[in-house]
Design a protein with these regions (language model features):
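An N-terminal hydrophobic leader/cap segment in hydrolases
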Residues: 3-50
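Hydrolase active-site cap/lid region
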Residues: 148-192
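Membrane-embedded segments
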Residues: 52-128, 141, 147-148, 154
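Alpha/beta-hydrolase fold nucleophile elbow
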Residues: 133-144
Length: 192
């Protein structure tokens, strides 16, 4: 009987730990100070978007002369745009402008992250892009965790194209493969 109580206590302890610290498992952000200076071999503009709830989203925006459109790149769940900016080169060399944002809690972006806020932030920037580009000139590119965000934003709009790089079928399904023994559906706060 004592083994059963001990086993149940360990199980409940794991579930509680996972629930309260799940962000440590899913996100590996690199935080940057506001005065950090990005360095890339091609010209860019740094943008800051102040969100209605007090959060702020930091982005980098590369432009080319006579652009064919813009690639809106939604990165994965690690580091910051400091290390992801290298992906701009391929698109710039093919005549596309390139915009990439950091999610809340990554890089210079600030605020509490949630699934709803990530989607709303990404949608806000998409709408900002439509002030300069018609939707048939916007390409949404989602990589890894960002593929879920890109797919959602694409479903709300009509971009020219949606590109998914190393996507996943279901965030819940991917996590459930490893911790199938937990009531995961009720434990996850972020299920992009």
């Amino acid at each position: 009987m004592i083994w059963l109580i001990l086993l149940l206590s360990l199980y409940l302890g794991f579930c509680l730990f996972f629930y309260f610290f799940q962000h440590l498992f899913f996100f590996r952000p690199e935080k940057l100070i506001k005065s950090f200076q990005y360095k890339y071999p091609f010209p860019f503009e740094e943008l800051d978007f102040d969100m209605e709830d007090g959060g702020s989203i930091n982005a980098i925006y590369f432009k080319v002369p006579n652009s064919r459109g813009v690639v809106y790149y939604l990165k994965g769940n690690s580091k910051s745009i400091k290390g992801w900016g290298k992906f701009a080169k391929d698109f710039l060399s093919n005549g596309y402008d390139f915009l990439m944002m950091d999610y809340r809690g990554f890089g210079k972006s600030r605020g509490k992250r949630s699934q709803e806020k990530v989607f709303n932030d990404a949608q806000y920037i998409y709408k900002w892009l439509t002030q300069s580009y018609s939707e048939d000139k916007i390409v949404l590119y989602g990589r890894s965790w960002g593929s879920g965000v890109a797919a959602r934003i694409s479903s709300w709009n009509k971009p020219r194209m949606l590109i998914l790089d190393s996507p996943y079928f279901s965030f819940f399904y991917n996590i459930n493969r490893y911790i199938f023994f937990t009531p995961l559906r009720w434990m996850l706060e972020i299920c992009a």
